[in-house]
Amino acid sequence: MKFVDSVIINVSAGKGGDGCISFRREKFVPKGGPDGGNGGDGGNIWIVSNTNINTLTDYRIKKIFQSENGKNGLNSNRSGKNGKDIYIPVPLGTRIIDNDTKKIIIEILKINQKFLVAKGGKRGLGNTNFKSSINQTPRKKTYGTLGENKNILLELILIADIGTLGLPNSGKSTLITSMSNAKTKIDIYPFTTLIPILGTVKAKKKKFIIADIPGIIKNASLGIGLGIKFLKHLSRCKLLLHIIDITINKKKINKIRYIILKELKNFNKKLFQKTRWLIFNKIDLLKPKKISQIKKYIKKKIEKNKKYYFISAKKNIGIKKLSKDIIKYLYKKNKEYI
């Protein structure tokens, strides 16, 4: 299934029903007064959060939403029925944007969140409302007003605590699988992660959500590769894990770091400024002596305040400590977080 995280829809709320002009016409009441009822209000259109969906795929085809018009008023002071409301379910993390002005209207971030995106038109008034001491037989009514009509951009930005980034085949998917309950496709080919994937990690009786996006390559910000368009899904993360394949030539480690950093900076400065930990993966493929040499090299080259780990996602080496440290970091950032 294609991962759809951005779609434009049209929402058109119902028109209000018109008021009615009518007079009582009953036996023995030859000059009955006005009895025209009011119209009904037009139906509203609501955006509602739904935890059972995680993409906007449903709206690739269905793009127009029209709620019911209010019914016209009737005689005998009978009001027209209100138009039925429409509810549009979206995943948590969906941003609602006015596509004409490009203004963010609201972000859907809470369970059971509900937002009125297009209000139905107001009902028209029947002639009963215009009776007065000087006008006992009013022939006046008002018409229902039009409902709101908007072009809305729905943009999904995943909600995750931790995000992973790195070159293709650095082991991001293996790490997510090792740490969490996510099931990702793992191969030796580039771009085996084709869509963002979320996993839940439990450690020390607490848990966090971790996101994996397709690998980023050099010049990704110019449109090369797959990862750059999914970088927005890391914007809500509190911590980024930069995964590096330790089996490469040690002198290329910093070069690889800066490839990713450059693409981050080009994409979004706020994302570039997020806290990042370096995760050196695949230590199971090297002999202890080689690992020791690389550790010494990295200690010289990496900034003193930079946090880094040596792990094997495949062999589950160092994963437990990494998970615990992430929990500590998140808890320290916000004591009410977990």
Curated annotation (Swiss-Prot):
Q: Which GO terms describe its molecular function?
A: GTP binding; GTPase activity; magnesium ion binding
Quote a single Gene Ontology cellular component term: cytoplasm
**Which residues participate in GTP binding?**
166-173, 191-195, 212-215, 281-284, 312-314
Q: What is its main location?
A: cytoplasm
Key words of the record: Cytoplasm, GTP-binding, Hydrolase, Magnesium, Metal-binding, Nucleotide-binding
- Please list the cofactors this protein needs: Mg(2+)
Functional note:
An essential GTPase which binds GTP, GDP and possibly (p)ppGpp with moderate affinity, with high nucleotide exchange rates and a fairly low GTP hydrolysis rate. Plays a role in control of the cell cycle, stress response, ribosome biogenesis and in those bacteria that undergo differentiation, in morphogenesis control.
Q: What name has this protein been given in UniProt?
A: GTPase Obg
* Source organism: Buchnera aphidicola subsp. Cinara cedri (strain Cc)
From the UniProt record, report the name of the gene that encodes this protein: obg
